[in-house]
């Protein structure tokens, strides 16, 4: 299956070749997520987050672009507010910044996560951190 991203990224239209959806082990996530696709050398991961699911705190060597396709997403940088994103919205996390992202506590959704370079995985996001009051982007 070929899935075209409905946006222009740094001057290029990217085409994603989808793999068979597969549930992921929970090593770097809390809750049920399904990675729908991934492409090297950079990564365009298409991920379905069930309600309440989220990543661990992590750092991207070269930053990360998060595009929300459907549902509601949350993103927080260390020391900053939780940002709420809706379908069609995007957020950029700069290189070297610790952050987490996932679904809202009561609503899941899908995201395109565009990254290059390494990822350093940190601590799990606590329930107290996750259930903070989000702000709209």
Predicted regions mapped to residue ranges:
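A short, N-terminal "cap"/entry segment at the start of jelly-roll beta-barrel domains
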Residues: 2-46, 56, 121-137
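Short acidic-glycine-tyrosine-enriched beta hairpin
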Residues: 79-95
């Amino acid at each position: 299956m070929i899935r075209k991203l409905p946006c222009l990224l740094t001057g290029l239209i990217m085409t994603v070749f989808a793999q068979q959806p597969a549930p992921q082990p929970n090593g770097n996530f809390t809750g049920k997520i399904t990675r729908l696709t991934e492409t090297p050398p950079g990564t365009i991961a298409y991920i379905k987050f069930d309600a309440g699911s989220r990543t661990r705190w992590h750092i991207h060597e070269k930053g990360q672009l998060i595009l929300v396709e459907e549902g509601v997403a949350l993103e927080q940088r260390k020391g900053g507010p939780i940002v709420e994103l809706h379908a069609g919205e995007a957020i950029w996390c700069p290189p070297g910044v610790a952050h987490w992202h996932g679904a809202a506590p009561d609503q899941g959704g899908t995201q395109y996560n565009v990254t290059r370079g390494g990822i350093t995985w940190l601590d799990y996001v606590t329930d107290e951190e996750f259930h903070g009051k989000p702000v709209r982007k």
